[in-house]
Amino acid sequence: MSKLWAGRTSGEVSSIADDFNSSIRFDCKLYKQDITGSMAHAAMLGAQGIISQAEAGQLIDGLQGILNDLESGALEFDFGCEDIHMFVEQVLTQRLGDVGKKLHTARSRNDQVALDLRMYLKDQIDEITALVKDVLSAIVAQAEANKGVIMPGYTHLQRAQPILFSHHLMAYAMMLLRDLGRLGDCRKRMNVCPIGSCALAGTTYPTDRRFEARKLGFDDIARNSIDGVSDRDFCVELMSAVSILMMHLSRFSEEIILWASWEFKFIELSDAYTTG
């Protein structure tokens, strides 16, 4: 498949430059979000009369077929494509002909990848949040089951004051509650739809940005098109929140290791969760 931008150049691109620019080996993880976003875009194009409703239906059905085939393993990624967007469009055009080329109307890969990233990270936040809630519930259950159990409290691994085991456990519950708050705040700021920003300054097509935002579960649209496609602060914010979460989990894990050691003997771990 020719490059989307091939019409702007006349010479051959170096294979070294091609390999350097290729991102499909890692952005293939975005396939589900890329296809879901494209289905919403096709629906919007049809609703706005930019393409016919019949063409929109063909595009949506074709995209669903690609998603199904990727999920089942019937279709494999072509790592010769530059990125996940070009791979999906290539397969769609092979299956539908010229109708497949209309999918990219009123859209750029700039706002497309910004959309994919936000959708992917929102999904990741939802998964992480569910797991943290499971850990939190387990900690609270252990605290409830061990009310009244007294243990030494340590500073610098020196016994300092007697404390309740449940009180020590609930310290981690408090940390995880703050972690959940950070994840939720991050998701809220991330939940802004950039689609329609195009390369950086929108499009002359009569698009409906809110149509796509609603269809994809976003709370709002990006109010500035340059900000919508160019900034990745939401990625850094999530990395910060997850780093703090992992620090808390690492700290808790180290406590469990100490408590289960021969020197402490405060707890016993099931053989199901230990190795030699």
Residue ranges and their predicted role:
Residues 1-202, 207-211, 275:
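A helix-coil-helix interface module used to build multimeric assemblies
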Residues 216-276:
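Acidic, glycine-rich loop-and-beta core segments that form the ion-binding/anion-interacting portion
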